[in-house]
Swiss-Prot record:
GO terms for molecular function: ubiquitin-protein transferase regulator activity. This is Uncharacterized protein YJL144W. One of its GO terms (cellular component) is cytoplasm. It comes from Saccharomyces cerevisiae (strain ATCC 204508 / S288c). GO terms for biological process: cellular response to stress; cellular response to water deprivation; stress-induced homeostatically regulated protein degradation pathway. Present with 149 molecules/cell in log phase SD medium.
Length: 104
């Protein structure tokens, strides 16, 4: 079935085998004045949303590597409680401090 706009062109157009019927569609006009929100428009258009990347940097403070893991555990357990909490496995005796930095 022909559209209303196409039917008027079909009636007024000369019939031939090589003719192409095209419908006249209303083109929506975009206003040249851009409306902004009252607080300002700070959005970025056509940018895909991606999560920020988190980089972890490990700073090695104790470079002494021991071959026997059981002696390493014994050394960690023999420290006093006043040495940066190293008895509980989160002090400098683990060999490094972890720093996180978020880059986006």
């Amino acid at each position: 079935m022909l559209r209303r706009e196409t039917s008027t062109i079909y009636r007024t157009h000369k019939k031939s085998n090589s003719s192409i019927l095209r419908s006249q569609r209303d083109q929506t006009r975009v206003d040249s004045l851009v409306e902004e929100s009252p607080m300002g428009d700070f959005g970025i258009n056509n940018q895909p949303t991606q999560p920020g990347v988190i980089y972890y940097f490990v700073e090695l403070t104790n470079l002494g590597i021991q071959e026997n893991t059981s002696s390493n555990n014994n050394n960690n357990n023999n420290h006093g409680d006043d040495e940066n909490g190293s008895r509980y496995g989160h002090g400098s005796s683990l060999g490094g401090d972890v720093h996180s930095r978020r880059c986006s």
